[in-house]
Amino acid sequence: MTVLAQGCDVAPPNNLTKPVRHESGQREVFCGLTGIVWLHRKIQDAFFLVVGSRTCAHLIQSAAGVMIFAEPRFATAIMEEKDLAGLTDANTELDRIVTQLLTRRPDIKLLFLVGSCPSEVIKLDLSRAALRLSQTFSPGVRILSYSGSGIETTFTQGEDACLASLVPELPAASGKDASLLVVGSMADVVEDQFVRMFEALGIGPVQFLPPRNSATLPSVGPNTKFLLAQPFLADTARELENRGATRLRAPFPLGVEGTTAWLRAAANAFAIDPALFDKVTQPARARAERALDNYRKELAGRRIFLFPDSQLEIPLARFLSRELGMQLVEVGTPYLHREHLAEELKLLPPDVQITEGQDVDLQLDRCRLARPDLVVCGLGLANPLEAEGMTTKWAIELVFTPIQGYEQASDLAELFARPLVRRAKLVA
């Protein structure tokens, strides 16, 4: 089958001079099942059961790197040819597997049935299966479902679908006092840093979605204000707004500038004295700015090309251009959510070329023509581009690595400096 590429330019945001290029064609992305790799570590009493093929099982196993004698909190109910052909009742087999799993693992309190490309192709209704199984195993186990399929999605949308499925389960907030909800997976160490910062500012109560334990689901209601920690949570944000919560407009907490603006949005919403805000944040800001100085020398003036991969590209481009002095050749993103990224777009250079969507062949042609100093791309493109003499950075590493907050600003900068240093050593 031939996929026809379609490209068009759409009006740029107010501060940008170049139209946003929109492309539709062949893509190079992982599927949403990849999100299980970090989500199963985050929610410590949850289990993710993928209903999919052997390919799905190999993807998760290799991406997570779990040793064979470990007892991980994910598995794959493998669909055989007879299931795909409709020769067996997939629901009966799924019920058997879930019963066996929960009998063996009584520590599981939250079970996600995760759809895949094969289960969606045969129209297996996992939402009905989750409802049916919940009636059997509640209240001891909560059973939910979401899609991790790679059909017309990118890999970070797996987390969005997972969290969106959790929102209807969140308890209703009681009382009239305002509360803050931070939405999006972050490393525990990063969460702890933000908790200390919010406590010093006098902001609270502060809760996180996803929680570390399903028994401590955050409450939500009309007095809930929420900050997005990740830019790929459109469905989750919409579900929270349907519950009455209010999203705080802010850049994302990448780098010194982004973290400060993100924290300031919360401080303003809770009427925190600006003098107190400066006093609390200044020490960490100063440390982060000093740490970035070393990497700025290496990265300033370097040209970078970002392929669409994770939806982190716009915040990363802002950080790289404004705090490290890099030149943006092209910033690709799988999907441009203009409302959630409005504060980021205001901070980009006015002449930046943004591409929404992907036609991988056309983007490869532009990348080869530009010959940037550094290319941020998926694993499938990295080795071929390296063979052509380009320096690459794996985009997926930016999702697996703790990069939010002041203390991680230098770690984020190092991720971009490291490939250039490696290349310099190889050619020396």
From Swiss-Prot:
Keywords annotated in UniProt: 4Fe-4S, ATP-binding, Bacteriochlorophyll biosynthesis, Chlorophyll biosynthesis, Iron, Iron-sulfur, Metal-binding, Nucleotide-binding, Oxidoreductase, Photosynthesis
The family note in this entry says:
Belongs to the BchN/ChlN family.
Under which name does UniProt file this protein? Answer: Light-independent protochlorophyllide reductase subunit N
Q: Which organism is it from?
A: Rhodopseudomonas palustris (strain BisB18)
A GO molecular-function term, please?
oxidoreductase activity, acting on iron-sulfur proteins as donors
Question: Which ranges does the record mark as transmembrane?
Answer: none
Annotated [4Fe-4S] cluster binding lies at 31, 56, 117
Q: How does it assemble?
A: Protochlorophyllide reductase is composed of three subunits; BchL, BchN and BchB. Forms a heterotetramer of two BchB and two BchN subunits.
Q: Please give a single GO biological process term from the UniProt record.
A: light-independent bacteriochlorophyll biosynthetic process
- Catalysed reactions, as listed in the record: chlorophyllide a + oxidized 2[4Fe-4S]-[ferredoxin] + 2 ADP + 2 phosphate = protochlorophyllide a + reduced 2[4Fe-4S]-[ferredoxin] + 2 ATP + 2 H2O
Q: Does the record's keyword annotation contain Nucleotide-binding?
A: yes
Q: What does the cofactor section's free text say about binding?
A: Binds 1 [4Fe-4S] cluster per heterodimer. The cluster is bound at the heterodimer interface by residues from both subunits.
List the cofactors.
Answer: [4Fe-4S] cluster
